[in-house]
Regions:
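Polytopic transmembrane helical bundles with strong interfacial aromatic enrichment
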Residues: 1-299
Length: 299
């Protein structure tokens, strides 16, 4: 297969994946709408209502799986077209990041039954891919000299996986805060009838961050080792390095507050979102508009 054919195939697969993520988004939206229309505690709720809502939810999950199964080879063939790993510019970071976020959700869907997160996850993946193919797209090209290193695979893969799980934990923390706002008034929103308790949401967000924080730590260390090999110094307070460290400190503070101080609930959720915002700032602003040796966006 020629490089051009691989590039075309990659583009087609990514567009096809977007179709299924769009279908998943609308199916999840219908599932939520039907749940709101007939609350779980309603005496008028029938077995047919439960069955109908469950079927559309299962269909939405199937669309999410199909989207992932198309996006995965789309990312792979992008690398084939460039004869390298597909992590050389913001377009490639974005499609791979969407893949990692989707994979983290599907893993959590299987292990923790998180179908209720499908709506925001599908929307986030769609927005990321839509931005990638419309604003960030660049033809396949060789890597910059500084990126030609085995550390690219080690460092970037760890960062992408960490980011996908961090963002999933942030979605759960945001859901916690939305429900908590209602429950402070003695209410529980209709759309949250089937969701886990606040305590379960709080614990799940914490478990995801605790699970992936060591990998993020490894990513930061691997980046420093790579910097020494490429530029002759381990740390130079480049904007990208600085914000990666800030993200590490923020999530470390979150874990410390949970384990040592005993923070739970609202305060922990806000701290989790704050940590996630530092990651997104680094990923979006620093990559696109930042200056320094880590400016690889290709824009």
């Amino acid at each position: 297969m020629s490089d051009n054919s691989a590039a075309v195939l990659s583009n087609n697969l990514i567009y096809s994946a977007m179709i299924f993520y769009t279908l998943a988004f609308f199916a999840h939206a219908v599932e939520v709408a039907w749940s709101v229309k007939t609350p779980a505690n309603s005496v008028k709720k029938t077995k047919l209502d439960f069955s109908r809502t469950d079927r559309i939810g299962r269909l939405a999950s199937a669309f999410m799986v199909l989207g992932f199964l198309l996006l995965l080879p789309g990312v792979i063939f992008r690398g084939v077209s460039a004869n390298r790993v597909p992590w050389g510019n913001m377009y490639e970071f974005s499609i791979t990041g969407a893949l990692a976020f989707s994979a983290a959700y599907l893993f959590a869907l299987k292990k923790y039954k998180l179908r209720w997160l499908g709506l925001p996850v599908a929307l986030s993946v769609l927005l990321t891919l839509g931005t990638a193919v419309t604003l960030l797209y660049r033809p396949s090209a060789p890597l910059m000299p500084a990126l030609k290193s085995p550390w690219l695979v080690i460092h970037v893969s760890a960062a992408i996986i960490s980011g996908g799980v961090f963002l999933l934990a942030n979605c759960i923390a945001a859901t916690y805060l939305m429900i908590d706002r209602y429950e402070q008034k003695g209410l529980r929103p209709v759309w949250a009838e089937k969701l886990p308790s606040l305590e379960a949401l709080d614990n799940l967000s914490y478990r995801l961050v605790a699970l992936v924080f060591p990998l993020w730590t490894f990513s930061v260390i691997a980046g420093a080792i790579w910097a020494e090999a490429a530029w002759g110094r381990y740390w130079g307070w480049d904007p990208k390095e600085t914000w990666a460290f800030i993200t590490w400190v923020a999530y470390a503070a979150y874990l410390h507050a949970r384990v040592t101080i005993g923070w739970r609930g609202r305060k922990a959720a806000w701290l989790c979102l704050l940590a996630g915002s530092t990651f997104l700032f680094n990923y979006i602003y620093v990559n696109v508009w930042g200056t320094g040796r880590h400016t690889y966006s290709g824009l």
